[in-house]
Amino acid sequence: SIGNNTNEVYESLLQGKSGITKNEDMASYGFRSQVAGSIKLDVSEHVEKRTLRFMGPGAAYAHIAMDQAIKDAGLTEKEISHTRTGLVAGSGGPSTSAMLTAHQIVLKNLSPKRIGPFAVPKCMSSTISANLATAYKIKGINYSITSACSTSLHCMGNAVDQILLNKQDIMFAGGGEELDWTLSCLFLSLIHISEPTRPLR
């Protein structure tokens, strides 16, 4: 990636830095494309353990971004948890790594009993909005929009509409996605990219 906060991203953009590097996991699984914008971040250092139990990596990244946004905006707890404060945030899909784990549990035990309740919020298509709204006690509108690679942009546009229509005063908007080989195999299994800094056209 090109940074884990606004300052790091800003500096990387000024320097023309590329965040695309070789991904060893993708190489070990035999992907023809073995490059990615890997995120160098230990989410457990930024999200409480109790909260993290319900999240896949994508939701955790969104949680960290929302925390940073709140601090940047100087919002109070009363302003965040208010009926005039809402949230529209999504992802292209659920946590595919969590879905694979659940599948492996069923295959191993020939039963879904050991999957556990924490898999539910990880595997919902609304995992981002559900996790963020719960963690930050959002009382206004709260839902996800899923539209593949345009998800975050559509969420932000929809959030602006809520303010323009005078339905909300403050909106949290955007999205989050996990970077895992289980997600990559759905669309990168046949694409070949070998040069990290050279985009596919």
Question: What are the residue ranges of the model-derived segments?
Answer:
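Single conserved hydrophobic/aromatic residue that forms the stacking wall/gate
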Residues: I191-R201
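Short, high-confidence coil segments that cap the C-terminus of an alpha-helix
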Residues: K167-M171
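Conserved beta-ketoacyl condensing-enzyme motif
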Residues: E8-V9, L14-S147, G176-S184
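Active-site histidine-anchored catalytic micro-motif
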Residues: C155
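Residue-level signal for alpha-helix termini/capping positions
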Residues: K137, L164-L165
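Short conserved active-site loop signatures built around small residues
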Residues: S152
